[in-house]
Amino acid sequence: MRNCCRERGFSVGRLEPETSFSCASDVKSSPDMDSVSSQDSLYLPNSIGASLEDQNLWTQFHQEGTEMIITKSGRRMFPQCKIRLFGLHPYTKYMLLVDFVPLDNFRYKWNKNQWEAAGKAEPHPPCRTYVHPDSPASGAHWMKDPICFQKLKLTNNTLDQQGHIILHSMHRYKPRFHVVQSDDMYNSPWGLVQVFSFPETEFTAVTAYQNEKITKLKINHNPFAKGFREQERSHKRDDVLKTLQQSPSKSQKRKKWEDSPEADISDFPKATRIKEESIMDPAGVYQNWVSDHEANQGLTPHSPESEGVNQEQQVPTSSSNFYIKSQYRRSSQHLSSPYDLGEPSSRRLTPDVATVPDSDPDSLAVLHVIPTQNSAQERTCSMNFSMETPMKQPLRGAIYSPYGTEQWMVPAQGPYQPVSYTAYPTDLSAQGAVAHPHSGMSDWSQYSLFPYSCW
């Protein structure tokens, strides 16, 4: 009998049974139990049993094909593995362990709303066993409350060092629960070994849910999946709509702001800057500084000089002003430089002119101007007439002076007449006479041109 029990016994080193058991009646006894007295007959191995908690929930998942997510960092199971034990000795120490074994040697795939075999299974990784954190504990402790393996995690990382259960994706597995009699996990020998498994806990390991029904079941029953529920989504959607109605979006705010008068006021300085930059055109800034020939080539059609709508003509107010400008023109011909044309428009001199009604253009003489290269100030002072364009003939009058031409006449110089000087003039009222001891040019011959100190 002992040899038979040893052959059917559980290998503690590998934690891999030769035969599987799915009910509490299928147990394996240890030879040490033969010494148990008759008073402890109530705690014999065949009296130990286990039941699955949340069996109805597991049954719903099992009917649709349970799927469990596996990740590299590890993912907890749902539904959780939770069992209840009974028939244990209340003062004996026990350990509780869980491992996962493949159901078959096939790899599966999801096709047309069902699972089907897709080939041979991959080599199974080294078997790992998860030990319940309360191990070892007395039988009374294990039978007091349901035993939950909530901290158990599944992973597909074959190099995991966190103690998680290593599984292959698209493979089917089932958990097994082991009850071991031992006072110490490492030193004392393991005695009684009892194994339990439940068909409702079979599942397929996946990295993403394939069956939509399984997804809905997990959303509806998992307390940690409240954020994925459709009811919660509808509430959040309603809240978002309410917030959008209370506070418009940025685009709507911007549209309203652009339509408001504040936007026009804020854009006004920008338009002013653009207008000022457009004035910096050379033809517009120096329009009064160019000659008639240059004006015909570069004058813009919107230039003030090309418009003849003004019925008044600028004329000098005094002849002296024109005379001074003419003198300045003669003296500045040799002083002009290329830098004169680069002066800003703010330094232009505005001539002192007055506006008078324009006369008949047919009776006015046309004044022909010879283009000269003068400075900016010269052109501003000397050119007081409007310029013509090739396509438009403006109305203009001749520049004239309100005074006669006699003021410009200079008396002719006669032959040179020597002026005599008297040493002692008697007429003190004479103007222009200078007293000098010598009366004529011949009297200067007795003096040398240079003093003797220069010899």
Swiss-Prot record:
Function recorded in the entry: Transcription factor required for both mesoderm and endoderm formation in the embryo; signaling determinants and concentration levels may determine which germ layer is formed. Acts together with beta-catenin to activate genes that are responsible for mesoderm induction including wnt-8, eomes t/bra, siamois, mix1 and sox17. Directly binds to promoter DNA. Patterns the mesoderm along the dorsoventral and posterior axis. Activates siamois gene transcription when alone or in combination with beta-catenin, but inhibits siamois transcription in combination with pou5f1.1/oct-25.
Designated name of the protein: T-box protein VegT-B
Ranges of compositional bias, category Polar residues: 308-326
GO molecular function, one term: DNA-binding transcription factor activity, RNA polymerase II-specific
CDD domains: T-box_VegT-like
Keyword Transcription included in the entry's annotation: yes
Annotated segments matching region Disordered: 229-276, 295-350
Any one Gene Ontology cellular component term annotated for this protein: chromatin
DNA-binding region, residue range(s): 57-230
Any GO BP: positive regulation of DNA-templated transcription
Basic and acidic residues composition bias: residue spans: 229-241
Assembly and binders: Forms a repression complex on the promoters of the nodal/nr1 and siamois genes with the maternal factors tcf7l1/tcf3 and pouf5.1/oct-25. Interacts (via C-terminus) with tcf7l1/tcf3 (via N-terminus). Also interacts with the other POU-domain transcription factors pou5f1.2/oct-91 and pou5f1.3/oct-60.
Disulfide bridge partners, by residue number: none
Coiled coil: none
Subcellular location field: Nucleus
Species the sequence originates in: Xenopus laevis (African clawed frog)
Keywords: Developmental protein, DNA-binding, Nucleus, Transcription, Transcription regulation
Pfam families xrefs: T-box
Induction conditions: By mesoderm-inducers including t/bra, and both FGF and TGF-beta family members. FGF signaling is not required for initial expression in the dorsal marginal zone, but is required for its continued expression during mid to late gastrula stages.
Superkingdom, natural source: Eukaryota
InterPro entries: p53-like_TF_DNA-bd_sf, T-box_DNA-bd, T-box_sf, TF_T-box, TF_T-box_CS
